[in-house]
Amino acid sequence: MDAIVADPNGVPTVEEIRKLERTRLCLAEGMRMYPAPPILIRRALEDVTLPAGGMGREITLKKGTDCFIAVWNLHRSPDLWDEPDKFDPMRFKRPFNNSSIEGWGGLQPELFTGLYPNENATGEFLFVLESVRAIILRRLVLFVTDFAYVPFGGGQRRCAGDMFAMMEATVALSVLLKRFDFELGCDPAQVEMITGATIHTKAGMPVKLKSRRSSKK
């Protein structure tokens, strides 16, 4: 990051964000392992038959049926991810498929032309990046995970601000890492996750910060 971001305060330009591949994929992997929503809820607007998937049989949902999707379980399924409990940001650069999951397209990084992973690569998404320097309007085509990765939902009802949120997080992380070194302030085993309206830590996560500009903590 030091070699890429020129601003002494760590605020990257759009072109610098494009070069911060590992930083962007670290954020994406964090969203895979610790997604904000515990579940997604969808309602069938008409009778629909879902493919067999890994269950070995098709499932028909009647019109009006509510469908609950467990995002945490989906993102950590060994059927959909290689070593799902391992933090591995570069997994998004490797293809992965499972022929036993009928109807699943797998992870296809060769379709990656955007900045962040998402559920599919079939559409263009418009976002506005607002920074102290510019307002940038761009169209990004994302790469396909075929709905194995849905931290912001998917389809027509997915979060409208997902790209802005990820760009904002990249800028924030850049600023923090430019200024501080971080160290976990407790035993990792003490950090417990619980579910409410979001998935979050039970009692926070103590972190020690050391200024990179001085010896003060």
What are these regions (language model features)?
Residues 1-37, 44-46, 55-65, 82-94, ...:
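Cytochrome P450 I-helix active-site segment
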Residues 34, 69-118, 134-141:
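Conserved cytochrome P450 K-helix/beta-meander segment immediately N-terminal to the heme-binding cysteine loop
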Residues 42-43, 71-73, 91, 153-154, ...:
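Active-site proximal loops enriched in glycine and acidic residues that flank catalytic Cys/His/Asp
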Residues 65, 71, 169, 173, ...:
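Hydrophobic, repeat-rich solenoid/adaptor surfaces of innate immune receptors and signaling proteins
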Residues 126-128, 149-152:
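Short FAD-binding loop at a beta-strand-to-alpha-helix junction that anchors the flavin cofactor
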Residues 136-138, 144-145, 154-156, 162-200:
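Cytochrome P450 heme-binding "Cys pocket" and the immediately downstream C-terminal segment
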Residues 200-217:
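C-terminal helix/juxtamembrane-tail motif
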